[in-house]
Amino acid sequence: MNVLVAKTANDAERIAYTLIKERISGKHDFVLGLATGSTPVGMYQMFKQDALDCSHVTSVNLDEYIGLSPEHPQSYNRFMKDRLFDEVPFKQSHLPQGDAPDPQAEAARYEDLVRKLGVDLQLLGIGENGHIAFNEPGTALDAKTHVTELTESTREANRRFFDRLEDVPTHAITMGLDTIMNAREIVLVATGERKAEAVQHMIESVPTVDWPATILQAHPGVTVVLDGAAASRCAESLQARGQEAATRFFTIRD
C-alpha cells in the first residue's frame, strides 16, 4: 500500500486525478471503476476542465441504490450523468440497475459483467465506518457483487443528498470486496478529519470485517491519497514506514 499525503484536499484530488489521467492516456482500451459521493466530485470537475479524452474508456460504477430509477435525481446513474458523463463522453458506461425487478439477479448480472470486462483501475472513497462502496462492517471479505442493507450511519451520512432521512434508500447493489480486489490497480482518496479514524484502521489494523477497507492491504497495487486531516491519526506509523509527502512526487498546479 503506497500512501501519499498532500497538503490540502484539493491537492489530494489533483494527485489522484493525475494518476488516473496517466493510466487512461497510456492504454488504448481502458476499464475505469468509478465512485460516487462527495469524494470524487472534485476529480470529475478536473476531467471536465481538461476535456479529458475518455472515448476509449469503459466505466463501471461501484454501486446503486435499490428502488431508484436511473432518472431519479438522487440515483447514482443521474449523479454520474450530471457530474461527468454529460460533458465527458465514455466509450461505454455501466451501473447496476437500481429499479431491476429482481435485485439479486441484477447483482449476479453485474458481477459477471465486471469480471468479464476486467477493471484496470478502480477509484474508491472510504466511509467513516471503513466501508468501501457499500460494503458495510461485517461484510465477508470474499463477497461478490450483492444486495446489502445500509447501516444507519451510512444513511445518515448520505442524508444531505435527500430531503429527509426517510427518503434515503435502505438497500443497495454494490460490488463486493472480492470484486473490488480483482481490479489491477486501486486508487483510494480520503480527505477531512472525519475520515481519520477509518484511514488509521485501513493502514494500521489487520484485515478484518469490522473495517472493510483493511482488505486493501492485501492488494499489490493500491495507492492511498490523503490530505493532512485524513492522515492525522496515522502520522507516526507513516513516518515509521518511510512514507514521503505527496508533494515531493507531484507538481501541484492550480
Curated annotation (Swiss-Prot):
Pfam families: Glucosamine_iso. GO terms for molecular function: glucosamine-6-phosphate deaminase activity; identical protein binding. It is an enzyme of class 3 (hydrolase). InterPro entries: Glc/Gal-6P_isomerase (IPR006148), Glucosamine6P_isomerase (IPR004547), Glucosamine6P_isomerase_CS (IPR018321), NagB/RpiA_transferase-like (IPR037171). The active site is at D63, N129, H131, E136. Keywords: Carbohydrate metabolism, Hydrolase. It comes from the Bacteria. It catalyses: alpha-D-glucosamine 6-phosphate + H2O = beta-D-fructose 6-phosphate + NH4(+). Pathway: Amino-sugar metabolism; N-acetylneuraminate degradation; D-fructose 6-phosphate from N-acetylneuraminate: step 5/5. One of its GO terms (biological process) is glucosamine catabolic process. The keyword Zinc-finger does not apply. SUPFAM superfamilies: NagB/RpiA/CoA transferase-like (SSF100950). GO terms for cellular component: cytoplasm. Its EC number is 3.5.99.6. The keyword rRNA-binding does not apply. Belongs to the glucosamine/galactosamine-6-phosphate isomerase family. NagB subfamily. Catalyzes the reversible isomerization-deamination of glucosamine 6-phosphate (GlcN6P) to form fructose 6-phosphate (Fru6P) and ammonium ion. This is Glucosamine-6-phosphate deaminase. The lineage of its organism: Bacteria, Bacillati, Bacillota, Bacilli, Bacillales.
